[in-house]
Amino acid sequence: MFAPILETLDSWDYPYIFLTSDSADPALTHHKQSKFIGTGNRAYAYLNGLSADVVVMTTPGLDVLQIKRARGVGHYCHIVHSLASPNYRVFGLDYYDSVLVNSVMQEEFIRQVERAHGVKRKEIFITGSTYCDALCARKERIVAQEGREIFASREGRKAVLLSPSWGKEGLLSKFGMRLIEAVLSTGHLLIIRPHPQSLISESLLIEDLRARTEGMEAVRWDIGTPNVHAMSQSDVMISDFSGIIFDYLCLYEKPVLTIDFDFDHAGYDSADIGELWEFGIFGEIGKRVREEDFGRLGEIIAKLTDGGGNQEAISRVRELLWTHARDSGVQSARAILGLRERVLGERLGRLKGYSDEILKIREVLA
């Protein structure tokens, strides 16, 4: 997520400190200015005592959940980690000062939520998707180096990737074995890749479904591996509203079949605005079906994968979503340094020593 930004700052020889709660984070070995801050309450305590001009985080809920606005921080910036709308739990972005987004659609979503909640208008910078850029750079290398085949033999069958979101509105919670059996009845292969949070919050559900599909020749559970394996080796995706839909579309330009149901917006920011823009384009990039269509999945999948998909629409949506493709690290770093320049400028009346830092930033941004 942060790798393209850190690599850009390193190339500019500009100092920063990267903090992580993942003891296995690659940045701890690849970037010298990195620190492991622990997990849980230990990490929250560290973050709540920060002193910095600008703090950039992917975690929503500032001043709502455990992470509070530290007195020593001049500016809080959120970076969106998905190509979809940043539809977090309610108030997820309300108290950030700025946001780095991927597209105009994400910007408009945030503006709608601001108006609905009556909160201060944030600065928004369209800087592209660092996540998508990093994944794009790694995908071919990962697949080539590991050479892992999910299915040893396909025998002419299509591979369907079931990749849902997590929670009560996710496909596995909503439909479970009914959907799995419907896909298998088509005669195709099925790769099930649950959302990582499902393994924590819905562990009993996942354990039950894995037990019920154990030994099925046409089923593979893809857990704990880079998602590019499943995406590259599948022909079509089935999902709900997960952001991985757009990863699949942007990286592989393959069709997506989405299950249409009455989404419960309670507890999410989207409860206070109109329909999410994603739901308006799902029909363009593949096919939208309801539970009563499960018996027709074979016919629908065949049409999508045998030239019946709208490739023109997929390419158009890809262009809208993936702005600044492969340049998000530079765009994001410039926005962050611009924010720091302003924070330092506001302090100049009291602390003249910051002027050298401002001059260095201007030199880098020139």
Where are these regions (language model features)?
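Active-site and donor-binding regions of nucleotide-sugar-utilizing enzymes
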Residues: M1-A137
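Conserved catalytic-core segment of nucleotide-activated headgroup transferases in glycan assembly
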Residues: M1-D13, T130-L209, K287-F294, T305-D306, ...
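Catalytic donor nucleotide-activated moiety binding site of glycosyltransferases and closely related
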Residues: I17-K32, S185-W221
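Short acidic-hydrophobic, aromatic-tinged amphipathic segments that line or gate anion-handling sites
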Residues: S34-G40, V219-I223, E284-R296
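Donor nucleotide-activated moiety binding/catalytic core segment of transferases
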Residues: T39-L47, L204-F246
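Redox-cofactor binding/interface segments in oxidoreductases and associated redox assembly factors
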Residues: V56-M57, H78, V101, L162, ...
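Catalytic binding pocket for nucleotide-activated donors in carbohydrate/polymer assembly enzymes
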Residues: L93, R121, G243-L320
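C-terminal amphipathic helix plus adjacent low-complexity
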Residues: E291-A366
